[in-house]
A protein has these predicted regions:
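Structural and coupling elements of P-loop NTPases
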Residues: 1-248
Length: 248
């Protein structure tokens, strides 16, 4: 019923995590977590889509100007519905969602998805997150190419230089796409969507890779207000300032 503070080290980086209660009855701690976090990871149940708790999370992130990454979880459930979940997000969210990954075999056998940023198929061999990277099969190439184009256009829209580059070359590199998504995330104009099965450890590492490489850090965070109403920005050259929050 309370938030839990934990961390993990991955790709030579430390990720600080505030795990908030999943029940709507204990959503009060969400506000404190959003207050100190750099980015919110909004987890959707693939069977239910956008729910009441989703609206609460979206409102808090909006009030505190914090970016959101969407994760469609439980894709291994019998009634998992990726497309329906995406449509419910599009209908309810004020931040435009963009698909980064989509499942190829949702349901009880779910163990693979296509990543349209990397343009690869990832298949997971076991429940320890062990994966193999494969070429996209011919029957999925048309859909993957279309979603990649949408991702490229979304990235280009966030930066004039990237837009000019897109018009000139007709596409963007993976680094260019990441750069555009980072800008869009910082402005809260885009919510990238990922596929996972937390129970089977499917997609977790790719999500963490994206957070490390693309999600905006504290230097891009909105300025805090001191008790005197003074704006305080993240600046290592200025005197140290502490912000205390409670997790219980």
């Amino acid at each position: 019923i309370y938030s839990t503070i934990l961390f993990t080290e991955f790709m030579e980086r430390k990720l600080n995590i505030i795990d908030c209660p999943g029940s709507d009855d204990f959503c009060g701690s969400l506000f404190s977590a959003f207050k100190v976090g750099d980015v919110g990871v909004m987890v959707f149940n693939a069977q239910n889509g956008w729910e009441v708790g989703s609206e609460i999370q979206a409102r808090y992130s909006r009030e505190l100007s914090k970016p959101l990454i969407g994760v469609i979880n439980q894709l291994d459930a019998e009634k998992a519905n990726f497309e329906g979940t995406v449509e419910s997000i599009r209908a309810a969210s004020r931040v435009k969602p963009v698909i980064v990954q989509y499942p190829v075999n949702q349901g009880p056998g779910f163990n693979a998805f296509i990543d349209v940023l990397m343009m690869k198929l990832y298949r997971f061999k076991d429940e320890n997150g062990t994966r193999e990277e494969l070429d996209i099969p011919a029957e999925e190439m048309e859909r993957a190419t279309e979603l990649n184009r949408e991702l490229v256009e979304m990235a280009a829209e966030n930066d004039e230089a990237l837009m000019e580059l897109y018009f000139e070359k007709g596409t963007l590199t993976q680094d260019d796409i990441r750069s555009g998504l980072k800008i869009g995330l910082s402005r809260r104009e885009v919510m990238p969507l990922f596929c996972t099965s937390g129970k089977r450890d499917v997609g977790t590492k790719r999500l963490m890779e994206f957070i490390i490489n693309v999600a905006p850090g504290p230097l891009k965070a909105p300025k805090f207000l001191s008790t005197e109403g003074e704006e305080i920005a993240a600046d290592e050259t200025q005197p140290a300032v502490a912000f205390v929050f409670k997790s219980q």
